[in-house]
């Protein structure tokens, strides 16, 4: 608050992970990966930027509030909580480790990559799409494209863009569930096998969405917004589809049930879900392509981690749309990245970041999706069509 200078009342500014570590140890430190998302860290020096802090001094008085930076993998201190005896199994004091406390930093540390030439998509409600570099990309072009240089484990840079994830799908399912649709979770559990089968059977690229549209950000009423925003895609044909109201079976022979059994027509549901999945794969294609252009890299594989990695159709279409193999999993990449960095910090594991990733690879069920050359033209056409409408 510029007028009241409330920062004058504070002694130290800590982000939430650092506050938790402070409560456990009494040591005030700022973990680097999370600090880098504040815009106050120099991405090259990997420390607070004195020029930026100086500029904030007169208006906000925050220059003195930030404690020293600590790299992920360093030990903050020993856990000391009044009234609790916190000891290891060998009776030693319990160390508190600064992991990649920004969740994407730990997720990228947990990517099961075999080489350093990879791109990643951390796919949850939102998607973080980018690559891992040894130095930041500080070009005007990268800034204009809304890419950021978030800092990572072991001196790395997470060069990435924050784009749409599973949010639109989640909102549609929530809406259908409120109308009593059991498949969408009205009974408390989403019937993913049924929804996945119906979505996969629906016509590809029948409708397309610009997943960066601000109109898709707000909660509520998502189904109607999707239908109002989509454009006819490249996959329209005269063959039967899930929109054909004369049949209870789609073109792949998957039963879609009775459209009158609830307030939700399964044919419409499948069409909407397919449009969302196709459009998200197209958004991933565009983000990966822009990542490569701006960073001068060409990944050998795309690692799809997080909840979106469970979506087989999305993984396959991302491979098809980008022309790059997609390795899906682990779902809990953030937890694994946290774990392996902690294990190395206390001496249970050792080696480089790639050695830690070998632990992730050996501990995870992964699925590889190769790009299908026969689908390349469809995605080129879809990309051009959407580009013409933007």
Which stretches of residues belong to each language-model region?
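Active-site core segments that coordinate phosphate-bearing ligands/cofactors
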Residues: 1-27, 40-42, 46-55, 86-301, ...
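A conserved helix-loop-beta module that forms one wall/lid of the active-site cleft
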Residues: 57-74
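Short beta-strand-loop/turn "lid" adjacent to the catalytic site in phosphate-handling enzymes
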Residues: 1, 21-42, 70-71, 76-81
């Amino acid at each position: 608050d510029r007028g009241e200078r409330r920062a004058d009342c504070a002694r130290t500014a800590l982000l939430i992970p650092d506050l938790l570590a402070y409560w456990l140890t009494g040591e005030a430190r700022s973990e680097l990966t999370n600090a880098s998302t504040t815009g106050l860290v120099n991405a090259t020096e990997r420390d607070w930027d004195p020029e930026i802090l100086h500029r904030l001094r007169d208006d906000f008085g925050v220059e003195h509030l930030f404690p020293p930076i600590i790299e992920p993998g360093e030990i903050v201190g020993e856990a000391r909580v009044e009234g609790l005896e916190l000891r290891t199994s060998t009776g030693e004091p319990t160390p508190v480790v600064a992991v990649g406390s920004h969740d994407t930093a730990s997720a990228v540390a947990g990517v099961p990559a075999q080489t350093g030439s990879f791109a990643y998509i951390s796919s949850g409600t939102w998607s973080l799409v980018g690559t891992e570099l040894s130095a930041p990309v500080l070009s005007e072009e990268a800034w204009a494209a809304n890419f950021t240089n978030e800092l990572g484990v072991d001196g790395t840079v997470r060069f990435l863009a924050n784009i749409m994830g599973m949010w639109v799908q989640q909102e549609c399912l929530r809406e259908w569930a409120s109308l009593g649709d059991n498949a969408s979770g009205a009974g408390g559990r989403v019937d993913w096998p049924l929804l996945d089968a119906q979505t996969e059977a629906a016509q590809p690229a029948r409708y397309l969405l610009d997943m960066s549209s601000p109109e898709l950000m707000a909660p509520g009423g998502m189904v109607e917004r999707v239908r109002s925003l989509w454009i006819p895609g490249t996959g329209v044909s005269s063959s039967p589809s899930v929109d054909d109201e004369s049949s209870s079976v789609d073109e792949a022979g998957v039963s879609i049930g009775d459209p009158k059994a609830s307030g939700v027509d399964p044919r419409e549901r499948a069409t909407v879900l397919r449009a969302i999945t196709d459009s998200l794969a197209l958004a991933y294609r565009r983000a990966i392509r822009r990542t490569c252009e701006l960073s001068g890299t060409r990944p050998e594989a795309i690692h799809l981690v997080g909840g979106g990695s469970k979506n087989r159709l999305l993984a396959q279409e991302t491979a098809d749309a980008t022309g790059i193999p997609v390795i899906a999993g682990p779902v809990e990449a953030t937890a694994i990245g946290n774990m392996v960095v902690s294990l190395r910090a206390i001496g249970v594991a050792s080696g480089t970041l790639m050695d830690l990733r070998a632990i992730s690879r050996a501990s995870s069920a992964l699925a590889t999706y190769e790009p299908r050359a026969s689908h390349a033209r469809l995605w080129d056409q879809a990309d051009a069509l959407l580009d013409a409408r933007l």
